[in-house]
Amino acid sequence: MHFIDEVKIYIKGGNGGNGCISFHREKFIDRGGPDGGDGGFGGSVIFRSNHHINTLVNYRYQQHFTAENGENGKGSNRSGKSGKSLILDVPVGTQIFSQDGDILLYDFTEDEKSFEIIKGGCGGLGNSHFKTSVNQAPRKSTEGEIAEEMWIHLRLKLLSDVGLIGLPNAGKSTFLSVVTAAKPKIADYPFTTLVPNLGVVYIDDEEFVIADIPGLIAGAHQGYGLGDKFLKHIERCNVLIHLIDGASNNVIADYNTVRFELESYSDYLKNKIEIICLNKCDVLVDEEIQKKIKKLQKVTNKVVHPISTYNNQGVNKIVKLALEIIKNQKY
């Protein structure tokens, strides 16, 4: 399935049915009174969050959605049938924005939440409403209300507790596969991960969601590489796990590149709690590991954890640390 996280769609509510002009007809009654029924209400447009959906791909190719119109009123004071509301399911984490993309209309942060974005048009009035003492046979009714229509933007921000960040090929996908049941595509070349991958970590009777965000490169916040498209998905995370390739010749530059992209994208990302991990320590001798850790700690003023996703060295410790941070932030 294609991962689609932003679409623009057109939506319209159902129009109300027209009121009816009708007169009572019955044997032996020459002039029956007005009995035109009202038009039915038009259907509304309702968005609903659904955790079984994880992409906006259903809105990629069909972009026009209209609720059902109400039926016209009928004789014998029978109202028209109301139109069916249109329910559009979206993934949890979807945000609805105005046509210009500037105004947030709704943010689905929980499952099975509904948002009525357009109300269906009211039905028109039948001629029975217009009977007066001086006009016993009104030939007047009203048309149904024309429902609102609009273009909107749907944007998906994944809901995860932990975001995995780092340059391409830093070992993020391997980390995800080791700590969860997720099976991301993994290979020894940059940009293996082309879409965010989600997995659930189970530890000590607790669980949390972790997202592997496609690799960042210099200039990601300006649209280079893949990072700009997916940086928004880590805005909701409680903590970031920053993996650095221990086999790199310049771990400081690698770290600074990713940090610069985060800080350039938003101040919100800049202040996220960060767990720094020097990965691929299985290919380094102890002296190299300590040398690179000291360099990183001097620049970051943070603890740097040596790990290896290849042989699972230190990974469980990182998972427990992330869980502790998540619990502290939530409670």
Swiss-Prot record:
UniProt cofactor(s): Mg(2+)
One BP annotation, GO: ribosome biogenesis
Location in or out of the cell: Cytoplasm
Keywords: Cytoplasm, GTP-binding, Hydrolase, Magnesium, Metal-binding, Nucleotide-binding
Quaternary context: Monomer.
An annotated GO cellular component: cytoplasm
Uppermost EC category: hydrolase
Domain Obg: 1-159
A Pfam family matched in the record: MMR_HSR1
PANTHER family: DEVELOPMENTALLY REGULATED GTP-BINDING PROTEIN-RELATED (PTHR11702), MITOCHONDRIAL RIBOSOME-ASSOCIATED GTPASE 2 (PTHR11702:SF31)
Binding site for GTP: 166-173, 191-195, 212-215, 279-282, 308-310
GO molecular-function term, one example from the UniProt record: magnesium ion binding
Identification of the protein by name: GTPase Obg
NCBIfam families: Obg_CgtA, PRK12297.1, PRK12299.1
UniProt EC number: 3.6.5.-
Classification via SUPFAM superfamilies: Obg GTP-binding protein N-terminal domain, P-loop containing nucleoside triphosphate hydrolases
Role description: An essential GTPase which binds GTP, GDP and possibly (p)ppGpp with moderate affinity, with high nucleotide exchange rates and a fairly low GTP hydrolysis rate. Plays a role in control of the cell cycle, stress response, ribosome biogenesis and in those bacteria that undergo differentiation, in morphogenesis control.
InterPro entries listed in its UniProt record: G_OBG, GTP-bd, GTP-bd_Obg/CgtA, GTP1_OBG_dom, GTP1_OBG_dom_sf, OBG_GTPase, P-loop_NTPase
Residues of the OBG-type G domain: 160-327
Family statement: Belongs to the TRAFAC class OBG-HflX-like GTPase superfamily. OBG GTPase family.
Gene3D superfamilies reported for this sequence: GTP1/OBG domain, P-loop containing nucleotide triphosphate hydrolases
Residues the record lists as binding Mg(2+): S173, T193
Main location: cytoplasm
